[in-house]
């Protein structure tokens, strides 16, 4: 993806076999995994441009950007922003008081975007509508990808397993969740977005588009492009009304393969991440 330079769909998709599409999907997944694990300094200009555009979509002015070198340094700066539980409470309250939290509005437009992208998928999208087999409605098994295709598992299911689910395992379960748990120390943290570690859903819808299995309108491509730019360009970020706190990417990331998986999933090694200020959380 360039500017949304979602890359163009592969040529002559009508004659492309499921196996060929899968091989192309593996390359796309690796591109996004590399972004998710990048240790290059943040592209601050791109980040601030895309965050300003996303703020504008919820009718908010450009915030002041506060850059920090680690999530640890961000914590004192984001005190008072709503936690995830507080955002859910606002959504569930039939008569909420006051102005909706900015983070809630951001979550809403992100969810709406994902719904529109799903509607552009040419097959039933497992992201929103679980695809099941047979009269009993059993879920499709997760098998080695080529074996799965040969066994009749739909390509759309294999792509969801092999891109969306696999990148979530690597970048959420394998990275951001243990780091966040270490950072929180058992207490609540304000809701945030994860920049490069939000790659799973962006990569999934990018791959479907590039494989010729989804069609998105110009506005959706532009909107997706801004979220993609954040994945390619920065670490975690906490949005506030006046200030948006953004974390640079780590200085060091060391991973190891997750045993028994089919889609090149990885996880952090113990102590496998160090941020630019020296914060080096020790992971169990």
Specify the residue positions occupied by each region the protein language model found.
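Short, glycine-biased loop/turn motifs at secondary-structure junctions and
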Residues: 1-284
């Amino acid at each position: 993806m360039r500017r949304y330079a979602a890359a163009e769909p592969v040529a002559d998709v009508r004659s492309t076999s499921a196996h060929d599409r899968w091989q192309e999907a593996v390359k796309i997944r690796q591109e996004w995994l590399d972004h998710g694990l990048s240790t290059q300094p943040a592209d601050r200009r791109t980040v601030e441009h895309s965050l300003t555009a996303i703020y504008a979509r919820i009718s908010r002015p450009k915030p002041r950007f506060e850059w920090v070198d680690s999530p640890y340094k961000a914590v004192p700066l984001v005190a008072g922003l709503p936690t995830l539980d507080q955002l859910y409470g606002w959504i569930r309250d039939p008569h909420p008081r006051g102005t909706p939290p900015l983070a809630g509005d951001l979550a809403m437009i992100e969810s709406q975007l994902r719904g529109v992208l799903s509607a552009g998928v040419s097959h039933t999208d497992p992201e929103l509508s679980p695809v099941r087999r047979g009269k009993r409605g059993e879920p499709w098994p997760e098998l080695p990808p080529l074996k799965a295709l040969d066994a009749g598992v739909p390509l759309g299911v294999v792509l969801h397993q092999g891109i969306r689910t696999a990148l979530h395992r690597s970048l959420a379960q394998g990275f951001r969740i243990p780091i966040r748990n270490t950072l929180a120390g058992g207490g609540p943290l304000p809701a945030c977005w994860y920049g490069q570690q939000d790659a799973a859903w962006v990569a999934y819808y990018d791959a479907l588009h590039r494989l010729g299995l989804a069609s998105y309108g110009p506005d959706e491509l532009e909107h997706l492009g801004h979220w993609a730019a954040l994945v390619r360009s920065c670490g975690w970020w906490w949005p506030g009304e006046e200030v948006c706190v953004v974390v640079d990417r780590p200085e060091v990331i060391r991973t190891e393969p997750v045993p028994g998986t089919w889609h090149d999933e990885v996880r952090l090694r113990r102590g496998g991440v160090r941020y630019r200020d020296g914060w080096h959380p020790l992971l169990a």
